[in-house]
Each structure stands twice: as C-alpha cells, then as structure tokens.
A protein has these predicted regions:
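Hydrophobic pocket/interface hotspot
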Residues: 6, 18, 22, 51
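Short, low-order "capping/linker" segments at domain edges
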Residues: 87-106
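Short glycine-/aliphatic-rich beta-strand segments at the starts of folded cytosolic domains
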Residues: 2-17
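Short acidic, gly/pro-rich beta-turn/loop elements at beta-sheet edges
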Residues: 16-18, 52, 61-63
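Short, glycine- and small/hydrophobic-rich beta-strand elements in well-ordered beta-sheets
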Residues: 30-58
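Short amphipathic alpha-helical segments
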Residues: 14-37
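Short, flexible turn/loop "capping" segments at secondary-structure junctions
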Residues: 1-2, 44
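An amphipathic, aromatic/His-enriched active-site/gating alpha helix that lines ligand/cofactor pockets
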Residues: 32-36, 56-92
Length: 106
C-alpha cells in the first residue's frame, strides 16, 4: 500500500468555497479516483490543508493527476489555493514521522 501526505495553503477567505468544491466533487474525477483505488482525507487547520491518501501503488495515485479532468480540477483549485508564479498549487510533501499497524508496512 502506498501512502501519501501533503500540505498546502488556502488563499484567505477560500475555505467555504474549497469545502463546497469537494462536497460537489466532479463525478468524472471521483470515478478516476475510484478506478485507481485512491482513498483520501483532507484536514484543515488555520488556513493550511493536510492531505492523507492511500493507493495500491504510487503509480495508481499519480494516474489521478493525469488527463484533462485532472488539469481542469487543478485550474479550478488554483483559484482557492496559494500558487507559484506559474499558477500551480504549492504542494509540500510531508515526511512520514511514524507509522503503526497497517500503515507500518506501506
């Protein structure tokens, strides 16, 4: 099992819009994630988002970020997230500090 932790920041005042976007997750994006067996949870704390995801492999996870639907979603999210000079969301990988149980093997 592949696990992934990332953090990124919301633009000021965008938390409600971010939540709504995910409450109304595009069906074609959800279908891609389900097909790749990606499970995900995102937590919020003081303007920072923390993503934790699992997938059968890194390749499965990365496939969810490919194709026109993923590109459109990234462009949509760029309006809510802090971005670099090219307009891409600034995503920082999290180093795993501890794992227990099923996560210890991944």
């Amino acid at each position: 099992m592949y696990t992934r932790g990332e953090t990124f920041r919301l633009k000021p005042g965008q938390y409600a819009a971010y939540q709504q976007a995910h409450d109304e997750l595009w069906p074609e994006l959800a279908a891609t994630m389900l097909a790749q067996q990606v499970n995900m949870v995102i937590y919020h704390h003081e303007g920072r988002l923390f993503l934790f995801a699992t997938a059968p492999s890194r390749e499965h996870f990365e496939r969810t970020h490919q194709g026109p639907v993923a590109r459109r979603w990234a462009e949509y999210m760029a309006g809510m997230l802090e971005t670099d000079t090219q307009g891409h969301a600034v995503v920082e990988p999290l180093e795993r500090a501890f794992a227990f149980g099923a996560f210890a093997a991944g």
